[in-house]
Amino acid sequence: MSEAKDLIARAEKKAQPASGLMKWLTGGDSYRLEEASDLYVEAANLYRLSKELSAAGDTFWKAAECQVEAGNEDEAGNTFVEAYKCYKGANPERACEALERAIAIFTRKGQFRRGAYFKFELAEVQETDLQDYGRARENYELAGDWYMQDQALALSNKAYIKCADLNALDEKYLAAAELYRKIISNSVGNRLSQWSLRDYYLKLCLCFLAASDTVAAEKTLQEALQEDSSFHGSREHDLLAAIIEDVKQGDVEAFSNHVFEFDKFSKLDKWKTTVLLRVKTSITEVEDDLL
């Protein structure tokens, strides 16, 4: 890719500090750095066209650094995003670094809605590509907070759900429960969220059962009936009422039967299956302790 390398060589030369008469002739540092960034962007796009994504990401990064130095942070934020897009398929860790630079610029400029969008993307890369669930949880929650500040409740819920689900899978049940409560608060009274509410109540109660807190689970079930009249008689309500009693009685067989019957008509997803298995195991462990 000789053409891209030639452009980079010209950009590097442009980016060198000028002094004296040369500085006056070239229009000052800002103009010189802007020219360098344009050359880097042109080279980066050539790398992108030839599918040399790591090289494209590196070159977009250099362009963004020139833009920052020139005082053009708005443009730099966009260019760091372009670097992220290139790195995403080739170097996920570097992709996260580029996106963090972009987010820092957006939030410094007060663009929290945009920052939230990319915080969510950042968390997805950390969860899916890097399996860094700790950082993913933190960034999903921050995305949810920023969306909440912007009154984008549906988007806020989407981010909080991701964080809560990861918390529960990591056995941080009370942290997960706190977020599910927040999600429910955002959703009660919203006609579009009516069917989702049942799922949120189910997840919240399962977290309490997994934490061996049947009192909190029963209290949550009663609150659900008060907050959402349609919850009474739903399959989620009937399952919870049954398995809470099964846990209290230490009846593993009844618990398994109730879960099996529910799953026949409302297929349980991987998250619910995992948490329900943990609850079942906890009943068995209590039985063993009593023997």
Swiss-Prot record:
It is found in: Membrane. The lineage of its organism: Eukaryota, Fungi, Dikarya, Ascomycota, Saccharomycotina. Belongs to the SNAP family. One of its GO terms (biological process) is SNARE complex disassembly. It comes from the Eukaryota. It comes from Eremothecium gossypii (strain ATCC 10895 / CBS 109.51 / FGSC 9923 / NRRL Y-1056) (Yeast). This is Vesicular-fusion protein SEC17. GO terms for molecular function: ATPase activator activity; soluble NSF attachment protein activity; syntaxin binding. Required for vesicular transport between the endoplasmic reticulum and the Golgi apparatus. SUPFAM superfamilies: TPR-like (SSF48452). It is a peripheral membrane protein. GO terms for cellular component: cytosol; SNARE complex. InterPro entries: NSF_attach, TPR-like_helical_dom_sf. Keywords: ER-Golgi transport, Membrane, Protein transport, Transport.
